[in-house]
Swiss-Prot record:
Homodimer. Belongs to the Fur family. Pfam families: FUR (PF01475). InterPro entries: FUR, Fur_C, WH-like_DNA-bd_sf, WH_DNA-bd_sf. Disulfide bonds: none annotated. This is Zinc uptake regulation protein. The N-terminal domain binds DNA and the C-terminal domain is involved in metal-binding and dimerization. It comes from the Bacteria. Its cofactor is Zn(2+). CDD domains: Fur_like. Keywords: Cytoplasm, DNA-binding, Metal-binding, Repressor, Transcription, Transcription regulation, Zinc. The lineage of its organism: Bacteria, Bacillati, Actinomycetota, Actinomycetes, Mycobacteriales.
Length: 130
C-alpha cells in the first residue's frame, strides 16, 4: 500500500507516471491510448478502475466536462477549483478565499455542517475568443 492507502501495481505505476508528465486533463480513453503508444499493455477497464481508485484516494482530480465526460489530472496538493474552456479544454486551477467564504456562508444559511465542495466553472478562454 502507498501512503494514500492505494495498492501499488505495475498498472497503477504506469498510469501515475503518465499523469506526472501531463499538465492538462485527459479522458480515460486518451490515457489508455497514450499508455498503449508507450508500450504498456493495460486494458481500458483497468485504466478506468485505477483512475476511480486514485480519485477516491485524492491522488487525481476528476472533472466532468459540460458533455458529461470524466477527465483526469494529477492532483495538486492544495484545495482548489477549476476554470475550464469549453472549446479547447484548457484548465486553470483557482483558489480564492471569496469562493471558500461563499460556500461556507451558503452551507450555514441552509443548516449544513461538515461541508466539502468542488467547483468547476466553464467558459471560453482568451485564446479561443481571439
Amino acid at each position: 500500500m502507498s501512503a494514500a492507502g492505494v495498492r501499488s501495481t505495475r498498472q497503477r505505476a504506469a498510469i501515475s507516471t503518465l499523469l506526472e508528465t501531463l499538465d492538462d486533463f485527459r479522458s480515460a480513453q486518451e490515457l489508455h491510448d497514450e499508455l498503449r503508444r508507450r508500450g504498456e499493455n493495460i486494458g481500458l477497464t483497468t485504466v478506468y478502475r485505477t483512475l476511480q481508485s486514485m480519485a477516491s484516494s485524492g491522488l487525481v482530480d476528476t472533472l466532468h466536462t459540460d458533455t458529461g465526460e470524466s477527465v483526469y489530472r494529477r492532483c495538486s496538493e492544495h484545495h482548489h477549483h477549476h476554470l475550464v474552456c469549453r472549446s479547447c479544454g484548457s484548465t486553470i486551477e483557482v483558489g480564492d478565499h471569496e469562493v471558500e467564504a461563499w460556500a461556507a456562508e451558503v452551507a450555514t444559511k441552509h443548516g449544513f455542517s461538515d461541508v466539502s465542495h468542488t467547483i468547476e466553472i466553464f467558459g471560453t478562454c482568451s485564446d479561443c475568443r481571439s
